[in-house]
């Protein structure tokens, strides 16, 4: 079966042959002889061949292609026929009729490329001709892009490209065709560069020998005069002049170019000629000209005609730096004869495509066309091509790198703006194709291309940045981006120059500079900054390089400055600048996020990988992060309710802690080339740590300063650098020479002066040795040498410099001349020649030296011989053509070339190493440098912009900055950010009344507020200063009533709901105002809606609703609830911010302070787990508010409530409970007047506290505090004076004395035991810094600034306690039922609550402890006294003006703006808060008031009775418990003496006290309780002394009190009470008569009882007592008589005793007949008359001895301990009682026995004994003897007795312990 492809070819043959035959050429009527026409002949041959085969693969591609290609080559065919042939060829390629694997394919492709690129045809009209050209393009495109195209050689590819370029740049062709050519080129370039990675680098030798064939020319149009129209005949004669290789002809522009002259006229001229001018402006490759570089070779259809073409040319590429010459490669020139052979052509001729390369001859022509070298070439498919000569059939080498390099070079040459041949179109085309090339291939991997990029390409691109054509400018920016994106590591200094250029464009103030250029430059910067790691690389490679600009820093400053519009209007440039700044933030933020996630993943992995460390060890990544987290300060990342919390600081990535050079693998493979990255010499390893970079930057600053100083005075500069340690001392010449060579900022003139100095000869030698002169001609070396410094003018200096130079040059080049003198002479001659040739002054005088003269001057200088003439000639021409100059001092191109060559030179040195770093390295350093400018720019843009997107972008920027600062723990950054944002919330600036509407209607403020709160919630950990601003915003929201209800409602003890609002209720206006207003509106006849008091408008209401909604989303409360997650430092700052709103400030507002206080308290409670750390702050603040308050106000009340709330919640925490209870003493330090106003709150608070926490109170001191508080609040007892004195002493800044400063009489350091505090040091004035953050644990309480006052001091302030005492106290009644404290006004409801609290303690046995029992008893007695007569004391002295106001308040606020508009606090709101005002209690509910007071008394009675009955069992259980525990501490005795002293006696006194109440009900109830108590079984254990004490302390004082007219209204009731009391007396006496008889003082006791009988008989007005008393007395006398008490033991016969006499003597005074009634029969003999007076001394002696020596056995003192409380008080831990010596008549408690060893046992009495007066005393005649009841009212005794009963203590005496309370 015949191959279908054969038919396709046959069909194409028929079409082409048919067209040829139809052509006018054959239209004669002569039959065509096909044999004679070569074209038809070859077609007929092909037909025969095709007919003879069945498979197309049986014949070579060349066979079936040749006839078609001959048609294409033929000059005689017309356009349409050529077009048909081209179509056929295209079809063969498209249909893949050519087998790529066939061995003849390569040759076929080569022929095809040659034919199509040299196509000729007879033109018809331009349009038809263009169709043919279009088809040529099509074939060339298909040829290169189909698989068979890979067989093309380098030369063919270059020809193909050149053909396309010609069409593209031929301006006479239509735009469509040109654009098609352009697209074709794009496709071809893309293909070639896409294949680039498949080609391997050619060895240098190969490149050198072959590249000469591949010169594409960026053609050059010469001057118009040079070129003529070429007219050609169809068959011109051939002139081929062979030129030997190597011959050069000078070209018009002075460059010497390798030439190749070929004969032949390849063109048929176009019918329309072009004017010379337009051609010059147009493309460079259309018509021939002498220096256009176009090849003029005659190529006819037969291949053999081409054989006489010869390639020639120098292998060396010569370039010139003059503009215009471009990089013209080897070019050819028209043979001079050529013009003579040009003849007139036919009119039907057409212009053909100008031909391709002058040297690209067909590879089939010559054996040397395929480079002959000894290497085989293997194409990408693995086919090996062996080079051999043509005769053996050369294998054609497929194209590779050489043609790509040539194409690349050509494209670069097109972009040279200084080449006059390059039109704008060409430059643009070049840039476009370079873009395609760079986009398609990793060009940097190819070294041959890299060289071109580094030099010409970058140079042309930078030059294009200065052109004014925006399209070229934009295109060059695009190419630059591609370059630096992919290969910046090879282009360090090029990148520096590029960025500097961009910065210049951005900042230049040139009005001609279009705005768009700046915008594009900025966009280019932004684009670069977005490349990952780019910014970091800028920083590390430039800012951290000694001799580079600080690119990153400068750019950041520039962008920041540029983000601020000068005019106030935001343009794109400003936003672009912001974008650039934000890219740094964005990338850093994303790295931080990644690190956090990575850390979390690591942690998860670690958790799953336990046990064992396989996961950690096996994974280098893990190790790295492990190292990071363990080295840094950070302890990892905690997740909680708020999402992520970032560690506060520390380096978190590889940059932290010096990663050794073991990290190279990680760092090195980031760039395009994965080879080992070179390390810059300035770094210790590939990723230096940040500390090292900072050192380098500091060093760089010093170097710049040193350089500046050197440029003024070299020595000074060197000295400066030596001082700073950058250069060694003494000077190291090598080091300095190196510095002089590598520092580009040094002034060349100064270098010259310094090194040429005679003193620095050694330095000069070192300096010269830094040059490498190997292989350089002397003049070249000299040129290099003299570029490094300015040659001074003096001859000796020049001599020195040249001498050292020539020595070094000789040693580098193996001493080429006879001796050093010859060398020196030649060098000098070169300098002279340079001066002669180029110095204007010299040229004016003499003609410049010729070559001959130069040679002549040097005759015989080379050791007597001549130098080589060629060398001299070369030197002469080099100097003549190019002056040796100091390029830095030149301008224009000379300087530019020099700067560029220096740049290339530096790039090739180790300095040019560009470090690629992994993304995320050095983020912290970069952020530290950029955050300031960025936040400033963000704030500005946020403020000025109205566009939603821009605002969102700014906010996103803020959030990212916050996230980064949180990640790295940068508080200052975060504070700055929060402060900036707070300004935009509009909360700080607005007045309160406008705030809701202004804030509500400002969307930007909403965004800012939400952001502030969101950031504070999320990153509060690192907030410091910023808290103040946030709190200020919160306060504003509070003032404007925009906060959620939960934040303004606070706990309250008294309010029935348990909560009150901190905000005043809205009241329309108070009564007075409204009256006036209504009157005014009535006068003006206006309705209320017209008056000024109008309701808020709907807009305002809507705005307020929006504002409330926004605040709800902000969730400010979260700030408090989540404060428990804050780091301690941040928490302390937050508390500081809240504390700062105190009454000291000028613009203080009470409500604000209360709000801040409440927030502070809530925060403390939220942080109760670590309350110890913040306790000091909050306690100081509360102290300040409570103790400094001069008057009651709402804030004081909130402070008191707050203190109690804290105590209630914190007492459960063991570690802080002691301090918390101690802090409650703050309340005792308050001014009594202020404290009384908050008594309700305190009473309710204490009740709550005891109910919830009684079990957590353990120490006696703490109980003492609580009971003292209960006493002060419940009964108006004044707080202990010791505390008050210290509180007063704490005037602002006075600083009270500490314990150590006070004179102390405490032996044995009792103070350590006291456990109480003064405010002297801790509660310092807040203005004073220093003592705030001390921890105050119990152990350290004494040192922490508390004045520790123990219970003893409070009970018993001794003279040494630092209080001034106003002289001795007046006498006190020793036996009073009352506690004797001066009770101030108190509040019955508070008392009731306190009694409830007491009841709670007493009724629960668990809460009664040895520590609080006596305190409890004492407090009960004080409450009893307070409740007496229905709390009559609470009625006295009560101020009636307690309504809530803060008039006299020290905390008054100054009026501030808008304060008049603050709503007045509603009268119903806080009116009764402080004073629980009397009007309400006294007037409003009198009945309930009395019910309450009655309730109190009954409760107290019940409590006392309960305690009394349970005392014995309680004490015995304690004693038992202590025995089991065998613990130390105070021994607990359960004997009757202890019980009497500590429990029974005081309780009985308390009950007795209530027996004296004015209310009958209470009296009777109390008497019943007393009777029950006295007769209780437990009391039977008491001995005589205790019973005597019972009479003295309980019964006698009771009877005395009842003698007073207690209840005048209830006479009968009083009678009954007195009767019951006297009956009780006699009952008790008789019941315990036996033990009482053992008393030595029995007589006195008995007489006292008789005395009371006497008084009671005469006390009442009714007969009740006068009848009852005699009966009682009779009963007692009879019992005593029966017991033979009246019989004298020693008298003879048991006669009547002295007692009998005294008894009747006393009774006779009031019942004279009783004796007769009772004892008629009984006659007691009188004693001896000689002894009437001896009895008196007896009584006296008894008393005296008893009183004088209390320790006498069997003789307890009658007055015992002279106190109303007796012994029982001596050990009471009543720390809550302060000395009240200043109040006259106040009773004192006895001194504690533990105060000092000397005071054990009862103290000695300090008064003389009482003396019984003789009965015959004249004073007593007819008067009941008042002196007998010595234990009664001493004031009365004193009044009736001639002898003072008590001596007044002398001032020098120590104050009696009995007077100390």
Curated annotation (Swiss-Prot):
Q: Where is the composition biased (Basic and acidic residues)?
A: 1434-1448
Keywords, A to Z? Answer: Cytoplasm, Golgi apparatus, Guanine-nucleotide releasing factor, Lipid droplet, Membrane, Phosphoprotein, Protein transport, Transport
**Phosphotyrosine found at:** 1316
Q: Where is the composition biased (Low complexity)?
A: 1286-1296, 1776-1793
Region (Disordered) location: 210-264, 289-353, 603-634, 1286-1335, 1431-1486, 1727-1812
Specify where the region named Phosphatidylinositol-phosphate binding lies, as residue ranges.
886-1372
Region of interest: Interaction with RAB1B: 1-380
Q: Which GO terms describe its cellular component?
A: cell leading edge; cis-Golgi network; cytosol; endoplasmic reticulum lumen; endoplasmic reticulum-Golgi intermediate compartment; Golgi membrane; Golgi stack; lipid droplet
Would you kindly state one Gene Ontology biological process term found in this protein's UniProt entry?
A: protein localization to endoplasmic reticulum exit site
Composition skew (Polar residues), residue ranges: 253-262, 1297-1310
Positions of post-translational Phosphoserine modification:
349, 352, 1298, 1318, 1320, 1335, 1477, 1775, 1786
Where are stretches of biased composition, namely Basic residues?
A: 227-241
Coiled coil segments of this chain: none
Whom does it interact with, and what assembly results? Can form homodimers and probably homotetramers. Interacts with COPG1; the interaction is independent on ARF1 activation. Interacts with ARF1, ARF3, ARF4 and ARF5. Interacts with RAB1B (GTP-bound form); required for GBF1 membrane association. Interacts with GGA1, GGA2 and GGA3. Interacts with USO1. Interacts (via SEC7 domain) with PNPLA2 (via C-terminus); the interaction is direct. Interacts with ARMH3.
The record's comment about this protein's domains reads: The DCB (dimerization and cyclophilin-binding) and HUS (homology upstream of Sec7) domains are necessary for dimerization. The DCB domain is proposed to support constitutive homodimerization; the HUS domain interacts with the DCB domain which may occur intramolecular or intermolecular.
Please state what the protein is called.
Golgi-specific brefeldin A-resistance guanine nucleotide exchange factor 1
What species was this sequence derived from?
Mus musculus
Give the gene that encodes this protein: Gbf1
